[in-house]
Amino acid sequence: MKIMQAMAGAGFGGAEAFFVRLANAFQRVNSIEQKVIIRENPNRAALLRAGGVEPIEMKFGGRFDFATPRALKREINKFNPDVVLTWMNRATLMCPKGDFVHVARLGGYYDL
C-alpha cells in the first residue's frame, strides 16, 4: 500500500507528536511505501529522519500561498498513492482531488 501523509501543523502538540510516531512506525512496515510532506519545521524533520523517514518540507502558508497546493499536487501525481492522509485543516484544504482515498485528521475543535 502506498500512503502519503501531509502534516501542516506549525507547533509540536499531541497530533504532531502522534504523526511523527505513526510515520516512523509506517517506515518499519515492509508492506507500506510512504511519502511524507511536512510544514517547514527543523525539529519535526530531524525526528522523522531519525526514524528513517526523509520528509519533503513545504511552506503550508496562508490563503496567498499558491505554491504549496501546486507542489503538493505534483508530489501526489509523482508518488501515485492509494491513500493520502492529511493532518490539520491547512493540509486538508490544500489537498487536490484525485484517484486516491483522502483521509483527513483535523486538529482541535471547530465550530461547524
Residue ranges: model-predicted function:
Residues 1-112:
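Membrane-interface segments of envelope glycosyltransferases acting on lipid-linked substrates or membrane lipids
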